[in-house]
A protein has these predicted regions:
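Peripheral, solvent-exposed domain-edge segments
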Residues: 2-10, 14-100, 108-114, 118-132, ...
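Proline-anchored loop/turn motifs at beta-strand termini and strand-loop-strand connectors
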Residues: 135-139
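Short glycine/proline/serine/threonine-rich loop/turn segments at secondary-structure transition edges
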Residues: 140-146
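Conserved structural position at the C-terminal beta-strand
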Residues: 149-151
């Protein structure tokens, strides 16, 4: 019986490792409930997400909310306005790369402003250690913020991936952050659909990014 129990435990550990390696997830700044060493413990009532790399939805269905998890960490990483974050990813299957967006919110995900966009080339050929530099805007106000990563893959099922990290920004006291709202595509029926684009000659939906709505985030001075 002890032998069977040991085998079962080993199998569960192996399955968890394989699950984390499937697809791609944000690992730095630590995505909410990421199992990586060094990431904070989940807040009370939440648990480590061993399926952190899984998509949150497809063009036909919504599996999880934007960010994947909505309860923020109690411990946050601190970055300065104007600082460049070398974002990192747990890479399993990069699906030929695709489109990525990074955005900030100061109201826990109600309003987002995009701070970087990569068309087609994001995660193309990505392997362990893959990193993308993302700069916090120099005029970003101080305060608690949510840092979001979105990815629409080039090859495979029409999916949307999203992870969020909880950060503290040290910038000016109050102010505005202007930009565009993120494109939320391949996320349930009725959402914009970006088809597969494994070849450079195939339509990739980039025209949808040009239609993103302008948005202004206002943070009150303290």
């Amino acid at each position: 019986m002890m032998f069977k129990t040991t085998i079962l435990a080993a199998a569960m550990v192996a399955f968890s490792a394989l699950t984390v390696q499937a697809h791609v997830g944000l690992s730095f700044p630590c995505a909410r409930y990421h199992p990586a060493a060094g990431c904070p413990a989940p807040p009370a009532g939440q648990s480590i997400d061993y399926d952190i790399n899984a998509p949150i939805g497809t063009s036909d269905s919504i599996n999880r909310p934007i960010c994947k998890h909505t309860v923020p960490y109690t411990k946050r990483s601190t970055f300065k306005a104007g600082q460049t974050i070398q974002t990192k990813y747990s890479v399993g299957a990069p699906h030929g790369g695709g489109h990525c967006q990074w955005a900030l919110s100061y109201d826990n995900g109600k309003t987002w402003v995009v701070i970087k966009t990569m068309i087609r080339e994001c995660l193309r050929g990505a392997q362990a250690g893959y990193s993308v530099p993302v700069q916090i805007p120099a005029n970003a106000p101080s305060g608690k913020a949510t840092f979001m990563w979105l990815w629409n893959n080039a090859i495979g099922n029409r999916e949307l991936y999203s992870n969020c990290a909880d950060i503290e920004i040290q910038g000016k006291n109050g102010g505005q952050l202007q930009g565009v709202a993120p494109l939320i595509a391949n996320y349930g029926k009725g959402s914009p659909v970006i088809g597969e684009f494994p070849l450079a000659t195939q339509p990739d939906g980039k025209e949808l990014f040009a239609k993103r709505k302008a948005v202004t985030i206002t943070v009150k001075a303290k």
